């Protein structure tokens, strides 16, 4: 009976010692958080292992993640996977559908990225357009108009300048034949008669004002179709056209005139652009939106993946994944790290404590046997 008591006692004592030792060892991984001193001598095992090696642990974790987990090769493969392609394309499609559904305007789109488009157009647009026009004038002011116009346009004008005669004569004939033309001729005759006085009064003894106006009108209409009159008009137009082509830009417009035109043109362009920017994109450019939805989403997804893949090495160097993880771990409170590790390895830590009790009990059993027989 005595022997059994000794064995049981030794088992209990051994189990307590083994279990408590493991519990203390586990606690010493985390505690204390700071070193303790007695008369300038640091107490051994303070701080605990994890607080003491915290920076080394953070460095090693960052190294392992960068070199073995989130590697450039792995991320590149993931980027080029069909799943990533579909995810990016789906995201682009959602944004395009939102553009159509919400009737978003260009101004609303730019405001989402903190750009006041109207202010940009008013402050920078006017200045930029006027500056570009003035630079163009300074650079080309001594060149002829013909040299500044596109060759195709000059060729077209050269071939069709004679058509201006037909156009002018037709317009003149239509005007003279109209009620407005008749009225204007009568008004001019009244003015002429009033100015010439008695001489015209004598003429009216033979012809009425109406007959004179009618004769003048018919003669003017006839002149619009007369070959010689048309030849004169053609010659005048051709000469003026050639003179216009041969003029230099600064002869056609001096600096002040061009500056005024540039200012007015820039104001018109920016005002027009500002008005258009308030219209929904789907209304302003329906064909472009259709193209975006049908074709661009896939192309844009491929472009994004391709560019990310090309610049992935540079991006990862800039991000510095290892340094980022190390910095983040070092910002964690030690209480949080302890809680995190215990949550992750709770089952294993309990097994270690249980193993301490079991091993201590086994050692106590053998010690009891030794105590009985020795």
Curated annotation (Swiss-Prot):
Main location: membrane
Keyword Membrane: yes
Topology term for the membrane: Multi-pass membrane protein
GO CC, alphabetical: plasma membrane
Compartments, record wording: Cell membrane
Ranges annotated as spanning the membrane: 4-24, 354-374
Keywords: Cell membrane, Membrane, Transmembrane, Transmembrane helix
Tagged with keyword Transmembrane: yes
Organism: Staphylococcus aureus (strain MRSA252)
A Pfam family per the record: DUF445
Name recorded for this polypeptide: UPF0754 membrane protein SAR1937
Membership in a protein family: Belongs to the UPF0754 family.
